[in-house]
């Protein structure tokens, strides 16, 4: 009888742990494939390719403190985002780590929301360093390392973002101190 009670108590504790993890950890992902046909030049070409294969994990440490991780399996594979953020007030949140820069309106949008494989305008590609069109900035997928202070004011009628970024792009430490 004692061993049955012990097993039930252990089972209850395990269920509590599993339920807590389910409430606090979110896993997600998506993939986008494409087909390209090009008849310019001497030879026509066509190909299928894997544009994006993304894995995401979000952890809720407390009601105010969270963390986020995003990894891309497409091409060479790399960490796209890894950051933690703390919400001091509904109007004031601080984020530190590697994340999308808030330089344009389009850059923070997910490709799933835009619903196009090549989803950014040429200006955003250049300014945010998404596709490597700026030779000085390189191709950083519109991401960088740094700290971001952001929030919404006046019942979400005014949003602000203030960031101090590394300037080197993703997965690189600062080269000029």
Where is each model-derived feature located?
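Bacterial Sec-dependent N-terminal signal peptides
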Residues: 1-12
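Outer membrane beta-barrel
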Residues: 14-167
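Short, intrinsically disordered, charge-balanced linker/junction segments flanking boundaries
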Residues: 168, 173-177
């Amino acid at each position: 009888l004692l061993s049955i009670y012990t097993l039930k108590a252990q089972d209850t504790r395990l269920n509590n742990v599993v339920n807590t993890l389910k409430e606090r950890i979110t896993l997600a992902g998506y993939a986008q494939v494409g087909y390209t046909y090009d008849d310019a030049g001497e030879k026509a070409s066509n190909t299928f390719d894997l544009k994006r294969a993304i894995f995401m994990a979000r952890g809720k440490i407390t009601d105010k403190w969270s963390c986020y991780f995003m990894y891309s399996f497409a091409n060479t594979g790399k960490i796209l985002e890894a950051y933690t953020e703390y919400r001091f007030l509904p109007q004031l949140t601080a984020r530190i780590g590697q994340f999308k820069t808030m330089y344009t309106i389009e850059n923070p949008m997910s490709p799933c929301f835009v619903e196009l494989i090549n989803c950014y305008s040429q200006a955003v590609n250049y300014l945010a360093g998404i596709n490597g069109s700026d030779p000085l900035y390189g191709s950083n997928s519109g991401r960088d390392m740094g700290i971001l202070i952001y929030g919404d004011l006046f019942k979400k009628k005014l949003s602000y973002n203030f960031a101090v970024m590394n300037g080197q792009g993703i997965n690189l430490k600062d080269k000029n101190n």
